[in-house]
Structure formats: structure tokens, C-alpha cells
A protein has these predicted regions:
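Amphipathic, Lys/Arg- and hydrophobic-enriched alpha-helical face
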Residues: 25-43, 60, 124, 169, ...
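Structural recognition of an alpha-helix C-terminal capping motif at a helix-to-coil junction
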Residues: 34, 48-55, 68-80
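Internal acidic/polar
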Residues: 2-6, 91-117
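Short, Lys/Arg-enriched C-terminal cap helix and immediately downstream tail that follows
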Residues: 87, 132, 167-180
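Arg/Lys-rich amphipathic alpha helix in sigma70-family domain 2
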Residues: 62-66, 76-96, 113, 165
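Helix-turn-helix DNA-binding module
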Residues: 4, 122-133, 137-158, 172
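Sigma70-family region 2
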Residues: 14-15, 41, 52-69, 88-90
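Short, charged helix-capping/linker segments at alpha-helix termini
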Residues: 2, 14-23, 33-52, 156, ...
Length: 180
């Protein structure tokens, strides 16, 4: 969906059209759930995050700035809510049943579909949250650096640096487990 369509839907929501918000939820519910699932590796927590994100989006829609992409705003909420869950539970992530694929497979799912799929997904789950978020947004959501920077509210150079560091950690973790 284009930025202009999303901005128009937000305007319609603010003008009192509940169907416009329903269209935004329909457009973004799977991507938001998938971001939370990749961050938390727990389907129940991911569903809770998705519900929480859309409730907060509805409550704070008037604070959305249309000069930014709507998906950046909603993904930022999903990442922040996921990080809050990780902090509050004092854990990195719980194992997810790998037989349950995400709703929309991304490039990292294709990459990890071979023999080392479980090892790759487990290694992503062990990353520090700031590294996990850039890996999830770049490889699983397929966002470019600039959009990841918008979502995480950091500079694009920071995204590139975190992505480089995350790749190095993943490479080391996988090599230690004999996955190449």
C-alpha cells in the first residue's frame, strides 16, 4: 500500500471513519505480528503485541505525522513493545515452534529454509535486541536502511553499523555450532 493511501486512511480515521482504521489494521496486522514474532520468538506474545500496537495506534492516531511513512510509525511501535516485553521478562526470547512459519515468508526465511534453518533462527533469537531488530527489519521485513533508520529512530549509518555487527555475531555463533 502506498504512503498516500495510508495517509488518506489516517485522515479518514481522524474524521471519524472506523472502516479506514479497519483497512489499516488489515494491511498491517500480519507484518506487525511477524515483526513481533521474529523479535520475541513466541506466538502468544506476538499476538499480544499486535493487539497492543493497534490499540495504541488507534489511541495515538492524532500524533501520527504524515510526513513519515505510516509503516515506519507502526513498526516502531511493534519493535518498542517487543523490546519492553523482552526487558520485563528479563529474557532474550523463547523458542518458537519452527513448524509454524510466519504468515509472510521473507528473504531470510528462504535463506534459512535449508539444513541450518533452526540454527539460524535460534542465533537471531540470541542477538542483543538492537541487533535483532535490524536483522528482523532488514532480512525478514525486507526494509532498506533508510526505512529501518526511520523505524528505529536512528541514523542510517547506525543501522549499517548494527547490521554489520549483528552479521558478525551471527557468523560467529553459527560457526561455533558448525553451521556455515
Amino acid at each position: 500500500m502506498g504512503e498516500n493511501v495510508d495517509a488518506a486512511r489516517v485522515r479518514d480515521c481522524l474524521a471519524g471513519d472506523p472502516q479506514a482504521f479497519a483497512a489499516l489494521v488489515q494491511q498491517y496486522e500480519k507484518p506487525v505480528y511477524n515483526v513481533a514474532l521474529r523479535m520475541l520468538r513466541n506466538p502468544e506474545d506476538a499476538r499480544d503485541i499486535a493487539q497492543s500496537v493497534f490499540l495504541k495506534a488507534w489511541q495515538n492516531l492524532s500524533s501520527y505525522d504524515p510526513k513519515y511513512k505510516f509503516y515506519s510509525w507502526i513498526y516502531r511501535m511493534a519493535i518498542n513493545e517487543s523490546l519492553n516485553i523482552l526487558r520485563s521478562h528479563g529474557r532474550d526470547a523463547e523458542p518458537v515452534d519452527e513448524r509454524l512459519p510466519a504468515e509472510d515468508a521473507g528473504p531470510a526465511d528462504v535463506l534459512a529454509a535449508g539444513q541450518g534453518r533452526e540454527a539460524v533462527l535460534a542465533a537471531v533469537g540470541r542477538l542483543k535486541p538492537e541487533h535483532r531488530s535490524v536483522i528482523v527489519l532488514h532480512y525478514f521485513v525486507d526494509l532498506p536502511y533508510e526505512d529501518i533508520a526511520d523505524v528505529l529512530d536512528v541514523d542510517a549509518k547506525t543501522v549499517k553499523s548494527r547490521l554489520y555487527s549483528a552479521r558478525q555475531v551471527l557468523k560467529d555463533q553459527l560457526a561455533a555450532r558448525g553451521v556455515t
